Every structure is written in C-alpha cells, then in structure tokens.
C-alpha cells in the first residue's frame, strides 16, 4: 500500500472531525474549552442543530393577509354604521331622548363624510356646510315686507314731494300758494324757480334712495333673509356653476352688486318717468 499524501491526510482528518461533531461531540468539546460543563447556560453548538431547521416558514407572506382582509371590511363597517344611524333616526320619535354621553351616529357619519374626498378629487374637510333651506313662509313674509317698503316709498315720494313740487314749478302764481305762509318765505323762493329743478330733483333722489337702501337692510335683518342672495333666481343659477367654468373671479358677488345697483337705478328711472308724465299733464291742462 502506497503512503498517503499530506492533502489526503488532512482530508481524512477533517472528515473524522466532522463525523465526530455530527454525533454530538461538538457541544462536549465546547464545554471543555469554555469550562462550562456544569453550567445551566445553553452551550449547544450550532453544528448539532438539525439541517431541517434551515427552511423557515414564509411568515411574511401570511402577515400581509390580515391587512388586505381588514381593508376589505371597511365598506361593510360603513354600511353597518349607516344602518344603525337609520334605525336611530326612526326610533327618535318613539323612544325617550338619549343620554348626552351616548355618541350620535348621525354626527359621526357627518364627520366621516366631511373628511372624505369630494367628486372633484379634493378633500371636503374645512369646506362650509351647505346652508339649510329657507322656509317658504319666511320667504313669503320677506316678500311682503319688501313690497310694503317699496309701496310706501313710492307713495311718500310721489304724493308728498314730487307731485306738489311739479305743480309748484308749473303753477308758480296759483292761488293755492298764498294760503300757506311758508310759501312766502325767503328759503322757499328757490323752489319756485324752474331752473333749479334738476339740482333739487337730483338731491331729493339721492336722499330718498339712500333712505330706501337703509330701510331695505333693516327688512333683511328683521326677516333673516338676504334680498338677492336668497330670493333672486339668477343668483341661485350662477351659484350652481362650479368655479373655473366661467373665467370671471367671484362671479356671484359681482352679480349681486350689479343687481343691487340695478334695483336702485330702476327706482330712479321710475321717478323720472313719473315726473315726465306729470309735467306733460300739467303743461297741457
């Protein structure tokens, strides 16, 4: 038999050591080296562990499964809350008032809907809540107050100022005026002069329209209804148009301002028409 080479000797020695370690000799040798043969610490060598422990179960795959199931259960939970809210709304008229400590499901749902994104993709959180619809009886009462204000304004202007003033400038020497002592005073003399008609009429219209506007604000404060924002159909139609469709900034506010000026201008046009008609009648009579 030929002698073994150095490489073969080292290989045989390595194989014997490996076989010895696989039979449990690694732990006893480790205890001898470290002097912990009688210690209670775990001194088991990793070489003694079975090779089957190398395969670990795919725990990461199963750990993500509950999250997917949890997301799929969100919609049924919302439906359940809505059903409970509907049952609560039906039972409010039959049951006693609930305790203040009990959470209101309707308030909970409204707060959840507030944080949800709108149809345009932007979150609706922080947006102003839509105004409650105005009672029809309140609208009728507001229209009644507004019509009464306009009627009294026109009556006072026409009967107590415009008609007497137009009669004065067209009949300055009438026998009616000497019966009143104030018509003979010095401050009344400019009213008799027809050349002052434009200045006097413009001053009167400015004062009367200013007073009417203030009284209109008092009517809005009394009825809690804004004259144009809540009653005008054109303003309601413009408010339905989304922002950006029409390239005009604050279209609703500008329309309200324009309608306010038109309301005052229409009163001025009405008074001018009345003056022209009365002047024509007094001139040819």
From Swiss-Prot:
Biased composition (Basic and acidic residues): 1-10
Glycosylation sites: 173, 196
GO cellular component terms, semicolon-separated: endoplasmic reticulum membrane; GET complex; Golgi membrane
Ranges in the topological domain labelled Lumenal: 170-196, 285
Membrane topology recorded in Swiss-Prot or TrEMBL: Multi-pass membrane protein
Phosphoserine found at: 45
Keyword entries, A-Z: Acetylation, Endoplasmic reticulum, ER-Golgi transport, Glycoprotein, Golgi apparatus, Membrane, Phosphoprotein, Transmembrane, Transmembrane helix, Transport
InterPro entries from the UniProt entry: GET2, Get2/sif1
Localization terms from the record: Endoplasmic reticulum membrane; Golgi apparatus membrane
Signal peptide: none
Topological domain spans for side Cytoplasmic: 2-148, 217-263
Transmembrane segments: 149-169, 197-216, 264-284
Compositional bias annotation for Low complexity: 49-60
Biased composition (Basic residues): 11-20
Biological processes per GO annotation: protein insertion into ER membrane; retrograde vesicle-mediated transport, Golgi to endoplasmic reticulum
Modified residues (N-acetylserine): 2
Quaternary structure note: Component of the Golgi to ER traffic (GET) complex, which is composed of GET1, GET2 and GET3. Within the complex, GET1 and GET2 form a heterotetramer which is stabilized by phosphatidylinositol binding and which binds to the GET3 homodimer.
UniProt protein name: Golgi to ER traffic protein 2
């Amino acid at each position: 038999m030929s002698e073994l080479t150095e490489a073969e000797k080292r290989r045989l020695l390595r194989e014997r050591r490996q076989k010895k370690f696989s039979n449990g000799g690694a732990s006893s040798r480790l205890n001898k080296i470290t002097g912990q043969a009688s210690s209670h610490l775990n001194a088991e060598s990793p070489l003694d562990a079975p090779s089957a422990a190398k395969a670990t179960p795919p725990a990461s795959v199963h750990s993500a499964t509950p999250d997917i199931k949890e997301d799929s259960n969100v919609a049924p939970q919302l439906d359940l809350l809505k059903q409970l809210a509907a049952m609560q709304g039906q039972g409010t008229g039959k049951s006693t008032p609930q305790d203040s400590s009990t959470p209101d499901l309707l308030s909970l749902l409204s707060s959840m809907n507030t944080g949800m994104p709108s149809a345009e993709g932007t979150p609706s959180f922080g947006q102003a809540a839509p105004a409650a619809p105005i009672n029809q009886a309140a609208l009728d009462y507001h229209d009644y107050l507004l019509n009464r204000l306009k009627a009294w304004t026109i009556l006072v202007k026409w009967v107590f100022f415009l008609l007497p003033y137009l009669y004065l400038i067209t009949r300055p020497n009438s026998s009616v005026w000497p019966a009143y002592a104030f018509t003979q005073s010095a401050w009344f003399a400019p009213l008799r002069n027809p050349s002052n008609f434009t200045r006097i009429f413009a001053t009167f219209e400015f004062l009367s329209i200013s007073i009417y506007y203030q009284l209109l604000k008092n009517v809005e404060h009394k009825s809690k209804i804004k004259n144009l924002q809540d009653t005008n159909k054109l303003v309601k139609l413009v408010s339905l148009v989304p922002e950006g469709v029409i390239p005009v900034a604050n279209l609703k506010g500008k329309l309200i301002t324009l309608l306010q000026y038109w309301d005052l201008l229409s009163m001025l046009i009405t008074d001018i028409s009345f003056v022209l008609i009365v002047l024509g009648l007094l001139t040819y009579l």
